[in-house]
UniProtKB/Swiss-Prot annotation:
Pfam families: CLASP_N. This is Protein STU1. Microtubule binding protein that promotes the stabilization of dynamic microtubules. Required for mitotic spindle formation. Residues 704-714 have a biased composition (Basic and acidic residues). Its main location: cytoplasm. The gene is STU1. Interacts with microtubules. GO terms for molecular function: microtubule binding. Residues 502-511 have a biased composition (Polar residues). Belongs to the CLASP family. SMART domains: TOG (SM01349). One of its GO terms (biological process) is mitotic spindle assembly. InterPro entries: ARM-like (IPR011989), ARM-type_fold (IPR016024), CLASP_N_dom (IPR024395), TOG (IPR034085). Keywords: Cell cycle, Cell division, Cytoplasm, Cytoskeleton, Microtubule, Mitosis, Nucleus, Repeat.
Length: 1111
């Protein structure tokens, strides 16, 4: 333990620092002094020499000595603040130049220590510290010192209440600094300093930004960030939104209106119309900002004073100006509602007159504006009178729009019928409807019918009286209107009003003659297709010879293939229903018979391998040649050859070229991995020219089973395979190759092929991607020829139906085992042969890892940063040359804790579409850490499960991240201690309100408590099932689980109730019948019956499974 400092010890330290001795000795002595300062009071006589000694150490050129001296100086400041502030004021100000210099140091640690020292010294000497920061650090040439001083200024304002007004001119200059990082820090500092500042301060900031000519991008970013977070509520989104503009004082608002008045005086001219449009747009921006909320009355007063000018803009012949004026009135109505009642009279007159304009845009905008005004302002009889006048207008457009205004009025006042009736509005509504139903224009009549049925829902007796007053034709049309709840007609079948009963407006009633003939031809072609025989010999002609196969195929029938869109869209009526293009008839499986029929079955595509065509085809199609048919997936040649004893007939692809049977090892594409998937479409001609190394048996006396050899096609190096013409993925041609006997290989040519190399038996293996530069060489050792094991052939019934992919499952399992073995071998080779990290790479990774952990804790790491962090985590498995681990325990704990905090945080600063991508990367990083360091994850299991449940509350079940959350929760539940998990999850889930969860699912504001609750119950059930008999809950754990399940059984949400029932079933399997029902004795009878049903169901399933395994 260190001792109290003495004068001799400090004097010796000063002498040692000035002497020419080793750095380690100096660092050791400074460290001793630092320990004494941290643990003991500094004697008054030693304060000045200690300051001198530490100043010497901090001014050294050696980093180790500077680190020791500057940290000791910081501890000395902290000690003297409590021990002797007067001495710190005197001696600390002398150290200010050194501290300000360290603000610009290259190492971030020294910059942080300098900022901390300034914060400590500010408590005793604020004036001197501010002067040094403002006049030295902020105006110097060191960019790091400027950044650090800005951070310090913000920190002092938030913690000590530092007044920053004197710093504003300096910060304006830093906003235009040559260094980009300084500009960014200055912008963020200004935003944070003025975020909660009063309105006059923000107005002064805007003036300062203008005076210092700050670049517009920075200025707009600052002003936008300082805007209020909420704007005036709007029931409907504006068709063309504007950038919000904000004012901070009433005086500023008055200056804006005073400037606008001059633009709206007199008539519209070429000189003032653009200023008028800009003024109207400015008013819209103010409404979008804070004028209507923060300065409600003042802004409305200004608008009323400017109303004449706004109306001049509305009735302008310039479309853009008129459109802006209409949009302004709509936004005023939405923002103020009944507060604009005094302006309604003149506005209704103006806009109803404008609806009769010949310009479609102006008329439509006026209609929308009137509708918005009616829906927002207080109802009075004058509004209804304006609508009645519009119904009598000589122009058709106001009469057409009036029906929509009536519907808006009825929807708004349906719950206040008395007010409408007592003011005479009901009579006017009746007059409007009668006038519209008898209007000369059919469009007006049709629109008014919809209004009538809405009126009938509010005043049915009045509507019945109107109906009785109509003539028979008008009454029938009204009854058949689609808006009639009891209408026998639907809107799709009727003619459009005013257009007559033409063919273009009515659905076709019967198909045309041409379509009928086409349907008849399609029916005839389907009759010519023979049915699949139930036995051999039926409907099949003898096998074709080689010469017949080389002939070109016969011409297709003269039937024009129509595109699918024409078939679907050109017919109408009942008999001419849309027809899907004809598809090849699915044929039943060929029975495994004796004779050449099994050989001939290879000429036809199998039912399972033939995929749907890539484009629509009619049923009358060109007959396909045998050469273009895909090969049967499962080899059947071996059995048929052995059983029948007949020679095998080859199937050449074209005349003059030898053709062999499909090898069990297919030629894969270089870019496609060998996976087992459904077969694709038929191969194209370009894949029929593969060259094969074919062993030909020279002796015909050999047994058939010794003729069976596997061959491998050589991959064409110059072939470019595209997805459209690739026959199938590797490994699909013979999925049962490892489990079935090899296939007989034969070739037909005019001259026999001589084999100079002796043949060798080929071992059957799981298909793997071969190299494109190598081909399979087939040899046979004559010495081991007699020792070959004869494959045992399995005989079945002669007419047995054989599945094409009967051994696909065996192949899938073999492929999976081989891939796992390859991965293990690669990992072992990588561990054995991997190069160790160099010291430079290790330092870089350590720096990046520390930065990544810091950004994760601050929740500011983006998607690319997470991917880089994942790469560093993968590199952490590589052993460095220095022996120092990259991911230490402290860093691992900090990273895992930060990741889980990141996962459950809402990330409100990101856009919703980016939040889920970032969360997915957080999840991937956690999974990678769990995979790499599974043993170290044990202390974080409970915390991780809580974070996963909280994160689950945000996402719907269809979101892709939900499956990742559930899988990670299952892994953590299997890793952690079961007792701890039960207690932690039960305590967390019990705090969730079941009713709130159901309310949220029904559209309430309770959040996603129901989702978290459901997932938590699911995790507990899965853990109980996975642990099995190894985990039996104790009495306390059983009581907690039973209490949780009992509360969830009463939930209003079905998913929570179901998960609670399944948890009870799993709990019953662990604790037995007596303990289980004793724990659930407080549950109601209905849930108990449901639990009993599922318990019995599970017992039957377990019993049936046990019997099946025994059998």
């Amino acid at each position: 333990m260190s001792e109290i400092l003495t004068d001799d010890q400090v004097a010796n330290l000063i002498a040692l620092l000035r002497a020419d001795v080793s750095i380690d000795t100096k660092v050791q002595q400074v460290t001793v002094v630092k320990s004494s300062i941290k643990q003991h009071m500094v004697p008054e006589s030693c304060i000045v020499p200690v300051f001198e000694a530490l100043h010497l150490a901090s001014s050294s050129q050696h980093a180790l000595l500077v680190n020791a001296g500057f940290t000791a100086l910081n501890h000395l400041f902290t000690r003297l603040v409590r021990q002797d502030p007067r001495s710190l004021t005197k001696e600390g100000t002398r150290a200010l130049p050194l501290i300000v210099e360290k603000l610009g140091d290259q190492k971030e640690k020294f910059r942080q220590l300098a900022s901390q020292a300034l914060a400590t010294l500010y408590k005793v000497a604020p004036v001197e510290v501010e002067r040094s920061v403002r006049n030295i650090a902020m105006v110097g040439k060191n960019a790091r010192a400027k950044e650090a001083s800005l951070h310090w200024l913000l920190q002092m304002h938030q913690e000590q209440g530092l007044q920053f007004r004197a710093y504003v001119p300096t910060m304006m200059e830093l906003l235009e600094d040559a260094d980009g990082m300084v500009r960014d820090v200055a912008k963020s500092t200004v935003i944070e300093l003025f975020r909660n500042a009063p309105g006059p301060a923000k107005s002064d900031l805007k003036k300062q930004l203008k005076n210092f000519k700050v670049r517009p991008a920075i200025e707009q970013a600052i002003v936008k960030e300082l805007n209020p977070t909420s704007s005036a509520p709007a029931s409907q989104p504006d068709p063309e939104s504007v950038e919000p503009s904000y004012v901070n004082t009433t005086r500023e608002l008055d200056e804006i209106f005073r400037e606008m008045h001059g633009y709206f005086e007199g008539k519209e001219t070429e000189q003032n119309w653009l200023k008028r449009e800009e003024s109207v747009t400015k008013l819209r921006r103010l409404i979008a900002g804070n004028a209507a909320t923060d300065f409600h009355d003042q802004f409305l007063t200004g608008l009323r004073a400017l109303l004449d000018g706004i109306i001049k803009a509305v009735v302008s012949l310039r479309t853009s100006l008129s459109k802006e004026g209409c949009s302004l009135i709509q936004e005023i109505a939405k923002a103020y509602g009944p507060a604009m009642d005094p302006m309604v009279e003149i506005l209704m007159q103006t806009f109803i007159k404008l609806t009769a304009a010949t310009k479609k845009i102006a008329s439509a905008q006026a209609n929308t504006t009137v509708d918005t005004i009616i829906s927002k302002v207080t109802y009075n009889n004058r509004i209804m009178q304006h609508v009645w006048l519009a119904c009598q207008d000589k122009n058709v457009q106001p009469r057409l729009y009036a029906s929509g205004w009536l519907r808006t009025l009825l929807a708004k006042e349906a719950h206040h019928k008395n007010h409408v009736e007592h003011t005479g509005g009901l009579d006017l509504i009746e007059k409007c409807i009668k006038k519209g139903l008898s209007d000369a224009n059919p469009g007006v009549r049709e629109k008014m019918r919809a209004t009538y049925w809405m009126f009938a829902g509010v005043w049915p007796a009045k509507a019945e009286a109107i109906m009785n007053g109509l003539d028979s034709t008008a009454a029938r049309l009204l009854q058949n209107d689609p808006n009639n709840p009891k209408s026998p007609k639907k809107p799709e079948g009727g003619a459009r009003p005013g257009l007559g009963l033409s063919k273009s407006t009515m659905g076709t009633s019967k198909p045309s003659v041409r379509e009928a003939m086409m349907a008849q031809k399609r029916a005839m072609t389907t009759k010519t297709v023979p049915t699949r025989p139930g036995s051999a010999m039926s409907h099949f002609s003898p096998a074709k010879s080689v010469s017949s196969l080389s002939q070109p195929p016969p011409a297709a029938p003269t039937v024009r293939a129509r595109p699918e869109s024409a078939m679907l869209g050109s017919t109408g009526g009942i008999s001419g229903a849309p027809m899907r293009p004809g598809r090849r008839k699915v044929e039943t499986a060929r029975p495994a018979t004796a004779g050449p029929y099994s050989v001939r079955s290879h000429d036809q595509p199998s039912a399972e391998q033939t995929s749907p065509p890539s484009r629509p085809k009619p049923k009358a199609v060109t007959p396909k040649s045998i050469t273009s048919s895909p090969k049967r997936t499962a080899p059947k040649m071996a059995r048929s050859a052995t059983v029948s004893g007949e020679p095998q007939l080859p199937t050449p692809t074209r005349a003059g070229s030898p053709k062999v049977m499909g090898s069990p090892r297919a030629t894969p594409s270089r870019s496609v991995p060998p996976t087992v998937a459904p077969p694709s479409s038929s191969p194209s001609k370009r894949h029929e020219d593969f060259s094969l190394v074919v062993p030909i048996m020279t002796s015909s006396a050999s047994p058939p089973r010794e003729e069976q050899r596997f061959v491998k096609p050589v991959e064409d190096e110059d072939m470019d395979m595209s997805p459209s013409d690739t026959p199938s993925k590797p490994g699909q041609h013979s999925p049962d190759a490892p489990a079935s006997p090899p296939q007989t290989v034969a070739a037909v040519d005019e001259e026999p092929i001589s084999i100079t190399t002796p043949l060798r038996s080929v071992e059957v293996a799981v298909p793997s991607p071969p190299s494109a530069s190598r081909s399979l060489e087939v040899y046979e050792d004559p010495l081991t020829r007699e020792q070959l094991t004869t494959p045992k052939l399995i005989f079945g019934p002669v007419l047995e139906d054989r599945s094409v992919n009967e051994d696909a499952a065996i192949l899938q399992q073999a492929v999976r085992q081989q891939q796992e073995q390859q991965q293990q071998q690669q990992q072992q080779n990588g561990a054995a042969n991997g190069m160790a990290l160099s010291p430079e790479k290790l330092k870089q990774n350590q720096r990046l890892l520390d930065s990544g952990i810091s950004k994760v804790q601050q929740r500011s790491l983006d998607v690319h940063g997470f991917r880089k962090l994942q790469g560093i985590i993968r590199d952490s498995d590589t052993k460095p040359t220095t022996g120092t681990a990259l991911l230490t325990d402290d860093k691992f704990d900090a990273l895992v804790a930060g990741l889980f905090d990141f996962l459950e945080s809402p990330l409100t600063n990101l856009a919703p579409e980016k939040t889920q991508d970032v969360k997915a990367q957080v999840l991937a990083t956690i999974k990678l850490l769990l995979k790499r360091t599974r043993a170290s994850f044990q202390p974080h299991v409970s915390r991780g499960l809580e974070s996963l449940l909280r994160a689950r509350a945000v996402y719907e079940g269809r979101t892709h991240i939900v499956s990742g959350l559930e899988l990670l929760a299952a892994d953590l539940a299997g890793l952690g201690d079961a007792s701890e998990i039960v207690l932690v999850l039960c305590r967390m889930l019990s705090d969730l309100d079941v009713d709130s969860a159901a309310h949220a699912a029904a559209g309430g504001v309770g959040g996603g408590a129901g989702r978290s609750l459901s997932m938590g119950l699911h995790v507990l059930r899965e853990m109980l099932d996975a642990r099995g008999a190894a985990f039996v809950p104790s009495d306390a754990e059983l009581a907690a689980l039973a209490a949780l399940a009992g509360g969830c059984l009463e939930s209003l949400e079905s998913a929570v109730r179901m998960d609670a029932v399944l948890l009870c079933v799993a709990l019953h399997a662990r604790v037995g019948d007596a303990r289980f029902w004793e724990a659930l004795k407080g549950v109601k009878e209905d849930p108990k019956s449901l639990i009993t049903y599922y318990i019995v169901k599970r017992q039957r399933e377990v019993g049936a499974a046990g019997v099946g395994q025994a059998a």
